[in-house]
Amino acid sequence: MLIHPQFDPIAFSVGPLSVRWYGLMYLIAFLLFMTLGRVHARRRPELGWNAQQLDDLLLYGMLGVVLGGRLGEVLFFQPAYYFSHPAEILAIWKGGMSFHGGFLGVLVAMWLYGRRSGKGFWQVTDFIAPLVPTGLAAGRLGNFINGELWGRPVQTDVPWAMVYPWVDALPRHPSQLYQVAGEGLLLFAILWVYSARPRPLKAVSAMFLIGYGVLRFAAEFFRTPDPGIFGTLSLGLSTAQWLCVPMIAVGVGLLASTRTDPAH
C-alpha cells in the first residue's frame, strides 16, 4: 500500500512569483501540443498546415480549453458551490476544470478558427485530435500532484492502492494515474498511429470521440464520483459517464458515415 506524497502545490518560485503545479502542467500541455503539432504537420504535409497557422490554432485552443473547462466545472459539476462563491469561478490556478466543458469550448474555438482561416471545421478537428491526449495526460498528472479527484476505495488487495491521508485511511485507486495511462498515453498512441495515414474526413475526430468516451467511461468506475447535474450517481452512472454516452454515440455515427468516403 502506498501513501500519497502530498506535494507542495507550489512547483517553484522565482522572487515573488510562485508557479503552481497545475499551471505548470498546462504549460507542458501547450508545449507538447505545439511540438507534436509541428511533427504531425511535417509527417502529413498534404494536410497543408504551417507554423503560423499552428500558433494561431494554439491560441484559439488555449482559450477554448480554459474558458470552456472552467465553465463546464461550474455548470456541470459544482454549480451550487460556485454560485455561492462566485469569486472562486476565476480561480483556475486552484484546479477544477471539466474535460467535457473544455471539449465544448474547443469545439467552439475550432469553429471560429476555421471561419477565420478558411479551413473546414472537420479539417481542423481531425488535425488536433491526435494531439489532445497529451494535454489530458498532463492535466491528470496535475490532479494527482494536487491530491484531487482521488479514486474509490479498493475492493481487493492491490499493491498500488494509495491512501490519501487528508481524506481518510482507506486504500484507494490512484484513478488520476489510470487516466494518465488511458485517456492520455494509450489514446495518444492509438490516434497518433491511426492519423499517420490518410483517412476520410471526420474519421480521426470520430476515433477520438469513441476512444475518449470509452476510456473515460471505464475510468469512472475507479474514481470517486463528482457531484454534478445528474447527481453523484444516477442509475449507477456518474455525471461524467452520462456525458460520455453521447460522445460515444456521435463518434460511432460519424465513423459509420465515413465508410464510403475517400481518404484525405
Swiss-Prot record:
List the pathway annotation: Protein modification; lipoprotein biosynthesis (diacylglyceryl transfer)
EC number(s): the record gives 2.5.1.145
Q: Report the subcellular localization.
A: Cell inner membrane
Query: Which GO molecular function annotations are given, in alphabetical order?
Result: phosphatidylglycerol-prolipoprotein diacylglyceryl transferase activity
Stated membrane topology is:
Multi-pass membrane protein
Supply the alphabetized keyword list. Answer: Cell inner membrane, Cell membrane, Membrane, Transferase, Transmembrane, Transmembrane helix
| A Pfam match | LGT
Top-level division of the source organism's lineage: Bacteria
Top-level EC class as recorded in UniProt: transferase
| BP GO terms, sorted | lipoprotein biosynthetic process
Question: For binding a 1,2-diacyl-sn-glycero-3-phospho-(1'-sn-glycerol), which residues are annotated in this chain's numbering?
Answer: 140
Q: Gene Ontology cellular component? A: plasma membrane
On whether Transferase is a keyword of this UniProt record, the answer is yes
- Which residues are listed as membrane-spanning? 14-34, 57-77, 89-109, 127-147, 176-196, 202-222, 235-255
Q: Its family? A: Belongs to the Lgt family.
Q: What does the function comment of this entry state?
A: Catalyzes the transfer of the diacylglyceryl group from phosphatidylglycerol to the sulfhydryl group of the N-terminal cysteine of a prolipoprotein, the first step in the formation of mature lipoproteins.
The name this protein carries in UniProt is Phosphatidylglycerol--prolipoprotein diacylglyceryl transferase
What organism does the UniProt record list as the source? Answer: Aromatoleum aromaticum (strain DSM 19018 / LMG 30748 / EbN1) (Azoarcus sp. (strain EbN1))
Q: Which gene encodes it?
A: lgt
